[in-house]
Every structure is written in structure tokens, then in C-alpha cells.
């Protein structure tokens, strides 16, 4: 009888097969001379209406040289040993329709407190939960079916309730930096501002609906005498269709809000101090080429508030505070854009040649349909159509062609981690390495349609959720027993009035 080889306890992933990495039974024990491991929780939403939370543990002494993404090659019979371990936290059905978006409230400064999780889907509801930031007891059983509750492994997690103020699908949820208010937008063309202390509505902003064009029955409907069946759209009855809001972005000063909508080539600016429209920027074909798309899908402010970016189906346009275009980004090869965010990267990775004492640089990050996450610098550009590509992660060059629906970043203990998730159900943990200057200079350049781009970062973990991911969020986790109770939230920062752009007076 042949002897079976004992499997190693480390997390392994076999490329080409849908194999779920084994669940970590316990976090690795750090030695007295080493730093404690990095712990954070990843929450994913999926087409299967399921919320899945799991804790990622990364040991302090991870072999970055052996896991460098540039030297990573996935073949059918190869196995990769990665340092990150995973522990399931909760897995349950949260909505009656696929989850559209989720948002986690910002952390408190220098204090580990509970966080608020808000999720939305096409069922018109926004579910609210309280998540504990303390590490739960180790769960030795992997959660495979969505039969558990939010408190499956941590009884400190709580269900706060449901918000039902939208008439159609909520598409965007934002918490203010001081966590005192929550801003939601939906396909019903409404923006609501609520107070998180008692979830009382404070303000409602309404975008106007585009006027329908007259229908020429003889021209548009052929020989028929009535409209075609596809002209009867139930979305118009419930506040959907053209004019619905795709995304919103809050300025760091909490005084200005941007919104982009369906069927409109424009971006609206709202004054939150008065609760009224501040202006409308029409996006002409000279500014946004037709190949980019017909409507803005995502909008985001930079962390400094000096610029904002609008993502279309196949391109991104960056505007300054004067609303003049600074940069137009068209990925090479051309691919659909799914998510954009501004993040801070160490200057050792960006290779900024300017004489500056700053250790970090803010870059625009874009995820695409072909599995890449691209990093662009929006400063020091030569022309409008010459973006500065710093590098990218993933993609077909290293055997990761699956679309990246969403991503998020977290910086803990001097380490920069980027977490990606896609419809293939795989969550990947990347270490962007603040101290990886040596690896940065040795990174291999990959040729892309006549141009060159470098793979940056190290892959430290892969986890298969076995569900099609639509959105994700990340939050820091601390040791059990150091979590403090919630403090009274401040109400300063934004207006508390109701209005729309058609109002003549403001009270």
C-alpha cells in the first residue's frame, strides 16, 4: 500500500482548479522579537445575495521575495504557498436581490471602535449592521452554506435595522468622516442625508428627470400604429430610468457633493450647506470621447480635494477644481472600467523623481475587466492624453484574467495592502510593500501593445469565496478586549435641510 504524503498546514492554491484554501485554525504565533501579525476583516457582497466576512492574518515575516507578483507564474500543476491565512467570521443571506454596494463607516482616530456596515441591493432596502473591531474566538469550522447569522462567530456584531426611504435601487452609500451622517443615492434620482445617531432624515436632494423626446410612430414603429413593447418601462413608474444616480462623491470639506446619473452626459455639484444645486458641468464630446461611453458610472474626489475623477465604461477623465480636464485615461489594451479610487503609495514604488520629503504620493487606481489594477499619477502631465502609468497588478500576463469588480486598500503597521475581488469569487491580498525598494528596482517590465508597464506589489494571499463578488470592504481588527464603546457622534459638517434644484427659497 502506497503511503500518503502529509499535507502542509499552510494556505495553498492550485492554479486552474477551483480549490478553496484551507481555513486557518489559529493565527500564527509571533515570536517575542518579532512584531505582531497584521489582522483585518474583508466583507464581500455577491450576486447570490450573501454577505461574507472573513479575517485575514498576515505574519510579520512574510517571504516577499518568493511571492513577488512579477515572478509569479501559474501553471496547471503548480502550487503556491502564500503566508496569509483566513478565518471565516460570518456568512448569511442579507438581501432578496443581488447586493449592489456596501460601505463601512470610517475608523475613529487612534481608537478602536465598532464600525457600521451599510449594504444595498435591488430590493430598495439599505441594511445596517454593527461590526466589532475585536478579534473573535477562533472558529474551527469553515462556513460553506449561507445558514449562519451575523453573530455566528462574534456575538458583538449586531443588526441595526433597515432603511427604506428610496423608491428604487440604492446605488451609492457614503459616511461622513466624523460618522455623524450617512448619504445615500439611488436610481430614483434622489439623494438622502440621514443622521446616524437616530437615523432621522435631514435633507433630500432631487435630480431632475430628462424630458422625454416626442415619438414619431410612423418613423420609429414601422407599419404599426402603437409603440413597441419595449417602450413600456416599469422603471419610469418607480423612479428609475434616465436621470437615476449612478454614484456620488463627497468633498473632504463635507460641503460639496458630486453626482453622475444615467442617460446624462453631465456631472452635478450640490452645495450641502444650503441644500441646493451648485452647478452642472456638461461633458461634451471634445472632453469625453464617444468611445469612453455615454454616462458617468463612478465619481471620486482625491483625498486632498484638489481634483476629481469620473469613470465611464471604457475610460476615465480627471478634472481639476476649476472643472477643466487635466487628464484622460484610456487603458491599453482597451478594457471596461469597474472601479476607481485614490490611494496613497510609497514614493519607493511610484519612483517620483521630484525633490520632495513626502514618503507617500496620491495616485489614481483603476480596476478593469481583464483582471488588472492600474496605478496612474495625475501630476506633472505633459498633455491631456498622456497619463503617467506607474504600474499595475494582475492581468493575463501572470494568469489572472478575471474581472476585478471592486477593490480596497488598508495601511497597517507600515504595510500597504490592496484587496481585490471579482465575479470569479476569488479574493486576492496584495502587499504593496512600503519597504520594498529593492524589489521595486528589480521588477520585471511587461510589454503591452508597444508600451511597457511594470508589475508592482507581492501576492500574499488567495481566498475563494465560491460566490460571484460584486463589492467588498475592509476594516482593521484589533486584539480582543481593547475595543471601546461607541462615542457620541458630532453633528457638524453638513447641512440639515431639504431641497431640490427647483426650489426658489431656502429655509
Where does each model-flagged region fall?
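Solenoidal tandem-repeat scaffolds enriched in leucines and small polar residues
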Residues: 192-325
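Loop/turn segments within WD40 beta-propeller blades
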Residues: 34-39, 102-114, 167, 173-180, ...
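WD40/WD-repeat beta-propeller blade N-cap
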Residues: 92-99, 143-171, 206-245, 283-295, ...
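Short loop/turn segments that connect beta-strands within beta-propeller blades
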Residues: 57, 132-134, 196-199, 272-275, ...
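WD40-repeat beta-propellers
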Residues: 54, 126-131, 191-195, 267-271, ...
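Conserved strand-to-loop turn within each blade of WD40 beta-propeller repeats
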Residues: 45-48, 120-123, 185-188, 195-196, ...
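Structured C-terminal portions of repeat-based eukaryotic scaffold domains
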Residues: 38-40, 46, 302-303, 307-483
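Acidic, serine/threonine-rich intrinsically disordered low-complexity regions
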Residues: 18-22, 27-28, 482-507
Amino acid at each position: 500500500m502506497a503511503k500518503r504524503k502529509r499535507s502542509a498546514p499552510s494556505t495553498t492554491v492550485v492554479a486552474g482548479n477551483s480549490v478553496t484554501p484551507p481555513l486557518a485554525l489559529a493565527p500564527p504565533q509571533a515570536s517575542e522579537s518579532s512584531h505582531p501579525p497584521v489582522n483585518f476583516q474583508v466583507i464581500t457582497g455577491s450576486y447570490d445575495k450573501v454577505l461574507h466576512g472573513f479575517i485575514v492574518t498576515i505574519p510579520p515575516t512574510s517571504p516577499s521575495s518568493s511571492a513577488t507578483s512579477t515572478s509569479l507564474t501559474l501553471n496547471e500543476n503548480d502550487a503556491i504557498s502564500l503566508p496569509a491565512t483566513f478565518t471565516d467570521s460570518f456568512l448569511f443571506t442579507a438581501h432578496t436581490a443581488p447586493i449592489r454596494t456596501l460601505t463601512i463607516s470610517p475608523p475613529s482616530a487612534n481608537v478602536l471602535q465598532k464600525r457600521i456596515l451599510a449594504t444595498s441591493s435591488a430590493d430598495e432596502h439599505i441594511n445596517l449592521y454593527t461590526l466589532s473591531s475585536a478579534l473573535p474566538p477562533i472558529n474551527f469550522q469553515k462556513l460553506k452554506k449561507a445558514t449562519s447569522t451575523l453573530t455566528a462567530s462574534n456575538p458583538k456584531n449586531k443588526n441595526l435595522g433597515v432603511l427604506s426611504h428610496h423608491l428604487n435601487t440604492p446605488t451609492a452609500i457614503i459616511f461622513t468622516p466624523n460618522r455623524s451622517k450617512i448619504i445615500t443615492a439611488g436610481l430614483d434620482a434622489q439623494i438622502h442625508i440621514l443622521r446616524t445617531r437616530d437615523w432621522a432624515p435631514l435633507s433630500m436632494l432631487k435630480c431632475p428627470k430628462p424630458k422625454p423626446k416626442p415619438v414619431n410612430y410612423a418613423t420609429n414603429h414601422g407599419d404599426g400604429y402603437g409603440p413597441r413593447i419595449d417602450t413600456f418601462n416599469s422603471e419610469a413608474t418607480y423612479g428609475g430610468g434616465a436621470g437615476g444616480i449612478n454614484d456620488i462623491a463627497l468633498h473632504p470639506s463635507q460641503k460639496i457633493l458630486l453626482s453622475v446619473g444615467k442617460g446624462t452626459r453631465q456631472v452635478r455639484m450640490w452645495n450641502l450647506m444650503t441644500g441646493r444645486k451648485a452647478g452642472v458641468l456638461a461633458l461634451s464630446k471634445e472632453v469625453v470621447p464617444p468611445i469612453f461611453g455615454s454616462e458617468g458610472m463612478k465619481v471620486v474626489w482625491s483625498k486632498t480635494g484638489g481634483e476629481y475623477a469620473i469613470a465611464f465604461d471604457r475610460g476615465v477623465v480627471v478634472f481639476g477644481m476649476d472643472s477643466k480636464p487635466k487628464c484622460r485615461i484610456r487603458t491599453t489594451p482597451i478594457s471596461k472600467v469597474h472601479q476607481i479610487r485614490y490611494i496613497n503609495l510609497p514614493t519607493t514604488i511610484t519612483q517620483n523623481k521630484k525633490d520632495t520629503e513626502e514618503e507617500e504620493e496620491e495616485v489614481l487606481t483603476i480596476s478593469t475587466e481583464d483582471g488588472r489594477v492600474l496605478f496612474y499619477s495625475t501630476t506633472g502631465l505633459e498633455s491631456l492624453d498622456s497619463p503617467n502609468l506607474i504600474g499595475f497588478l494582475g492581468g493575463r500576463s501572470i494568469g489572472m484574467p478575471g474581472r476585478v469588480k471592486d477593490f480596497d486598500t488598508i495601511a497597517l503597521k507600515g504595510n500597504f495592502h490592496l484587496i481585490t475581488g471579482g465575479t470569479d469569487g476569488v479574493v486576492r491580498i496584495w502587499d504593496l510593500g512600503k519597504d520594498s525598494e529593492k524589489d521595486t528596482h528589480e521588477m520585471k517590465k511587461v510589454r503591452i501593445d508597444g508600451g511597457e508597464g511594470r508589475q508592482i506589489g507581492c501576492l500574499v494571499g488567495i481566498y475563494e469565496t465560491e460566490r460571484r463578488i460584486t463589492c467588498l470592504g475592509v476594516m482593521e481588527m484589533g486584539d480582543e478586549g481593547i475595543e471601546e464603546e461607541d462615542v457620541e457622534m458630532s453633528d457638524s459638517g453638513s447641512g440639515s435641510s431639504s431641497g431640490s434644484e427647483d426650489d426658489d427659497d431656502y429655509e
